């Protein structure tokens, strides 16, 4: 079976957190805010903890999962500080979710049939019994965590042949370890089943926007933060990504419609194709023999992102809710267990249907109420400030904003319909941050006056207003250490109060950067190895975004290009600062004709070699 590999390397290239100052204490306002959370939610409900521990078989005794070179891939025991009551430096609701996510090991989901390894990475790896072997669902972020999970299964459940590897969607925490699984299994007949468009989407997301997304990733997942009660306590969707080698493998089979069935070694599966919701392409799986439903990442124990803070395409809350309703209609009468590729399973037909319905209603509500209020003339910021979930949803832990948030999800649905402009003429052509900051500071009466007003706001617990004041001052006077330190203190308190893991991580990472505790160099997540796996057409699109159009605006250059490794030809035309191409065309008047492999071309445009 011919395979092409994609070296993601995302986790390897991200900087480790630098040692910082002593942990900042929570202010009385933050303590009060976090104490109030305990009165709003039923922390005596321990059902999730019972489900998260149910079926436990074994876990690794090691302190960490390690890469081949001895470096830490995933710190298994780094989350022990989460034991006990939430401190004042953490939102108790997020702390509870993080405790659940930190539970790790091999678990039985359906006796003798379905097993999960959880807590070895951000996402789970699932094993489903066929007549004579296994189907593996998803492969975590990296080689080390995927192999650790697979070897734990072999140790406790036997060394059975793997008949198929299913990857539910093209996010790296689900496919990064797939090549390692393929090599470990060494079964040339093993099927690799993915949703249609998986390979292209995996490449495009991690390459086309990889550099900017990589830096935002490091903020969102708290990769630059220490793991303690004043730092990274998890993402809400899981703990954190493993670090190490990640490779993409070409699939052998694609699912493109709902209702498609496959029988692998005697086990029947029915697929639901659910694109443009949690991921550009994704699929869920029904196992009729086991009355078990794999919800991929469409139904989880959190309010998910309708627009992820790391950056991606907006997700359609209406479509998402309809997919879940279709799940209920198709399988609600028969299901006995539902499991996802994050978090823990849910058992029992009635309990599952209640859980599914709440998730469906939550996404529908966010979508519909955003549009209702937009049609009444409210801006996205106003909607996000005013909208609340109904009590029946708001009181459910599975509908809390641990990963997404009501605030930024509402803004995403507004953006999906109306774009970035809120309709206020003042926001049509605003000043850029530095110029705005300078005029803002001047209008208030200078930097010292801004700090005076900001300190008063800080002392009164008005952290959002304080952040606005100081953000403008830092843009106006980036070397003003008093402003930077105070803004870092503000971000820290906002992080301590945040129920969303990504919000907390963004705030606390921003605080570290303001204090000078982070290497500000942008991680380079794109290299020739990854880029050269793009198809020729997408590779040339990637080439085009490397062009500085403002410098090339007066140039007109035509080049004929032949890729020797795949045989494809293209005509490239640089004109008016834009680089267009036509696949399969040549131009007799071209300045030059070039024959090159995709790898050498990628190295050339990434300046890894000189022309």
Where are these regions (language model features)?
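Divalent-metal (often Zn2+) His-rich catalytic cores of metallo-beta-lactamase-fold enzymes
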Residues: 25-38, 292, 302, 318-382, ...
